[in-house]
C-alpha cells in the first residue's frame, strides 16, 4: 500500500488479525475506528478503542473527534494502531452479546494472564488452560490429540511453569485431564467459561496509575468497571480503600492535581497527585467512560441493544441445534464404529479359536500316528511271542523224545528251555504293557475326536454369526437416531436464555460472589488442582504476588469480599483513611 500526498497508510492490529487502510489527512479517530469495527463486524463498540504508541513511548488511546494526523502518533509508514478493549463489563455473562466481542475479550484477557499482567494462581491457570484448549481445538479426541499435541501451544504463565518441577509432558497430562471434562462445550461457551473465571481475579480489568496523596505517599490508583480503588505500592492485589461509581458526583484535574467530588456533600474532596498531566488526562478519560457505562447498565437496554441480544439468542440457538445434530450424528457413527470393532474382534477371536482347534487336531493326528506305531510294535511283539512259543513247544517235544538222553545233554536242553521261558515271560510283559498303553491312547484319541467335532461345530457356527451383521441392528440404530434427532430438535426449539439484569442494585459488589464461591464443582476442581500442584511446587520460586495471594486465601479474602470490606463506612471516613496512608 503506497501513501500519496493526501493519503496515509494505517495498520490496525486486533487480537487475531491485521488490517490495513489508507486514510486521508483529515480522517478523524472516529472515522478510522468506524472503518475497523465495520470491517470486523463488531457492534458492541463501546468497550473498545484504538491504541497507539506516542512520541514518548507511552501507550495512548486515540481521541475519536480529533484528526488522526494531529495526534501524537509515532511517525512511520504505515501508522501503527492496536484495536483493544478499553473498558470491561461488570459481568461478562450478562453483558457480552456478540461472538466477535466475546472472542476479542477472551484473547486479550488470556494474553494478559499468560504475560502475568493479571496475576493468576497456579491451580486457576491450569483450569483456564483447559478451557483455552477446548476453545481452540474443540472436544478431546484420543486418536487425534496424541501426546505432544499441545507442545507448541502457549497455555500457562512462565511464572507458574518455573514454580513447579514438572516436565512438559506432565503439564500436558494435567491440562488434558481437565480438557476432557469439557466435552460437548461449544468453543464460544469455553471462552465464556474462561472469562467468567478470569473476571474474579483481583487484577482483571483494572487500569493502574501511580499516584501520591497529600502526604506524598506513593500509591496505586485502580480504575475499573466497579469504581476507584486505592492500593499500597507493594500490593496491587488487595485494595485498601474503595469508591463505587455511584458515590462519585464530579471528576476534574488541575495540572497534576486530580479532584473527585463525592455525592455526599459533607465529605471532603478526594484529592491525589499524578506524576504528569498527561496521566491525569488518561485517568479522566477512563473514569468518564467507566462511569457512563456503569450508569447505562442500570437503565433499560436501548432498542439497538435489544435487537442485538435477540439476534445473538437466535444465532446461539441455531448454532446449538446444529451442534446437537452434529453430536447425534457423531454419536451414531461412534456406535456403528464400536459395533464394527466388536464384530471384528469377535471374528478375530473365532479365527484364533479355529487355529487353536486346528493345532489340537494336528496334535491328535500325531497321537493317532504314534498309536498306530504302538499297535504295530505290539503286533510284532505278539508275533515274536508266538514264534518263541513254537520254539519252546518244539524243544519240549524234543525233551520228551529224549528221555534216554544222557544226563549232561538233558541238563543242557533243560537250561535252554528255562532261558527261552524267561524270554517269553519278558516278551509277554512287554506285550501286556504296550497293549494297556495302546488302549489308553485309543481312548484319548476317541475322546479328543469327539470333543473336536463338537467344538468345531460350535466354532463354525460362531464364525458364521460373527461375519454376518445382524439386520435388526441397522433398523434399530436408524430408528433410534431418527427419534433422538426429533427429540433433540423439539428440546431446543423452545429453549431460551436471557441475560438477566437487576437495575435496582446500587452497588453491585454488595451481592457479588465469585464463581468459585457459587459453584461447588468449580471449588472441587480448584481444590484438586491445588493439591496436585503442591506435590511439585518449588517454594524458592515464590513471587511477592504469590505470597500476597496465599495470605489473602488464608484470611478468607477474595475479590468481592475485599471490595465490600473497603467500601464500608461513609465517604468521609474513607477519604480521611486515604489521606493518612
Swiss-Prot record:
Pfam family, one: ERM_C
GO molecular function terms listed in the Swiss-Prot or TrEMBL record: actin binding; cell adhesion molecule binding
Domain (FERM): residue spans on this chain: 8-298
Biased composition (Low complexity): 459-469
Presence of the UniProt keyword Metal-binding in the record: no
Location (main, coarse): other
Region named Disordered: 452-519
Biased composition (Acidic residues): 477-486
Keyword flag DNA damage: no
PROSITE patterns: FERM_1, FERM_2, FERM_3
Gene3D superfamilies reported for this sequence: 1.20.5.450, 1.20.80.10, 6.10.360.10, Phosphatidylinositol 3-kinase Catalytic Subunit, Chain A, domain 1 (3.10.20.90), Pleckstrin-homology domain (PH domain)/Phosphotyrosine-binding domain (PTB) (2.30.29.30)
Compartments reported by the entry: Cell junction, Adherens junction; Cell projection, Microvillus; Cell projection, Rhabdomere; Cell membrane
GO process annotations (BP): animal organ morphogenesis; establishment or maintenance of epithelial cell apical/basal polarity; neuron differentiation; positive regulation of early endosome to late endosome transport; positive regulation of protein localization to early endosome; regulation of cell shape; regulation of organelle assembly
Domain of life per record: Eukaryota
InterPro entries: Band_41_domain (IPR019749), ERM (IPR011174), ERM_C_dom (IPR011259), ERM_FERM_C (IPR041789), ERM_helical (IPR046810), Ez/rad/moesin-like (IPR000798), FERM/acyl-CoA-bd_prot_sf (IPR014352), FERM_2 (IPR035963)
Ranges of biased composition (kind: Basic and acidic residues): 495-519
Keywords of the record: Actin-binding, Cell junction, Cell membrane, Cell projection, Cytoplasm, Cytoskeleton, Membrane, Phosphoprotein
One GO location term (cellular component): filopodium
Phosphothreonine modifications at: 562
Membrane topology label: Peripheral membrane protein
Entry function: Involved in connections of major cytoskeletal structures to the plasma membrane.
The protein's assembly and partners: Interacts with cytoskeletal actin.
Protein name according to UniProt: Moesin/ezrin/radixin homolog 1
Protein source organism: Anopheles gambiae (African malaria mosquito)
